């Protein structure tokens, strides 16, 4: 069979790198085929399950199957209908292979290797919603006969001989896996300090105050990958609710949502994150002495009283405006703003890690700024928010009650009342000059990059980054406290990926209101006479129904600012924001927006050459963009060491007449506005789901861009791919995939994760 080495194969040194680079690239999240999550030992031992996590049409909520939460042992997972992929029978090297679905999948690929050139044949289904076949050991022979090309890695190049042999040796040896990682010595001391703060306060805080603050922090950080000051860049932790006190082994309290009733005494504990880090769920939150001082300033030392603790009933717990009313709005808002990108990432990378339901309501590229927490603005005042808190309830309170379209009825009425309250509060305010109005915008203290963000959306995935990136966008948001908080509780804390159709539809429809609110705040900074025209241009068709929301028209017609000097106030506003935010807005974006040579960052001759060439690629626009991948990574080879090559991301920004329907596929002509599609190019790796790779030598970069800009139809694109693309069949595919992951780690040593290849195109 195989000659096994005398020493056990090292899981971390030999096996895990192969799993991460060849298997986790598809098996890393809720959308891992057959729920086979290969990011950790626990996921491998758990095995597979035929039920899909993502099922927007289900009428009843599914039982959650979250790794490290909903079951802790292999036996418990078997009770939840997970089937083994490793041998669980008689243990010997032959049985360990014969009885391993994982081995047989690998063997199937060796027996039926895929083509090494051209596109994959039509019998390969690489669509995201493809039917899944999840054979058990007893079903495998039938599966292999029906799907001879269904070996692993599916629809990707074969493993190398060395990779295959290493995995087979490991499986034959019984798939030995070391114990879980434990906290480092540097982290241990800090964990004790943080657990003391969360569970006991500062010594000067009441029990109620300590409990309320800890609950607030947990409900906002429960999905964070916590990183402690002074620890390794790749060492992360999780904040959990445990039934055991600090000093004892953690026993996670499993609830469907972080604000559900724990039904027992809660201790807030910090535990080591186990397994591989994948880009699509990696959200880093830094904990340090400085952060602790900030929390003490905002929450523990601030003067307020907590006379009673909020209920865990859904109508209270899902509405943070009500649940945490005792904590000053300023403290809550500043906490969110300090790491605004993290909280925006929450609905991009959180439970909705395949987020068509949530993300289909936002544009493909837009900018975000925030109201200043110290500005004299009514929606930021405690009294106003406390009086309107009932209007700020969201469908999260329904949990999985099947109240279809509640967001179009009950919650629409609440939104109308909130709008009317805002109008009444500001109706007597006169307009201010646009330059003075800039003082309403948070400037991040002149140093916090979270003050200006850009969001890119690509159908059902998205990314967010610091600064204003790309050309001036069609739309932008100005966010206040209640919008940011409600986004978190609707799509992160309150979103159940296992929920039913009603839950998912109502979340999506309510997010439409939140997007509108952020956009309308931006519009209020424009002249009233232009505002409605711009808004009508943004969205056509179905979106016009927004006018039916009582209060919106009046809000749109109120004059808030004056002093515009051009006929294009929207661009003028963007430029005002750029000047006001200064370096926090970015470097001017030489590739996409600023044509002045002064915007070109200092770089080597070849990098400048590549930048100038890629600048021309941003001229690609209109109908042809629909042919191109949403997110394409470009490797420009510099002729030296691989680590000296540079990476670009080419992003297709799709324009829409409407972003209001969750059921219409984005390609339907009544939604898409192909003529206004654009391209953005950045000199870094953006996004978690690359759709395609291009590789080009620096001396060929001008020809690369010329060929790219010459694409007019599908045939032109296929010819371009034949020259520069890395197809699923390409002999060097894995080499370049590895390079992009390594390059991401070089660019972002702490924030990087393994890219997901589930969406990689067959082109």
Report each predicted region and the residues it spans:
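Aromatic- and Gly/Pro-enriched helix-to-coil junctions and flexible linker segments
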Residues: 1-763
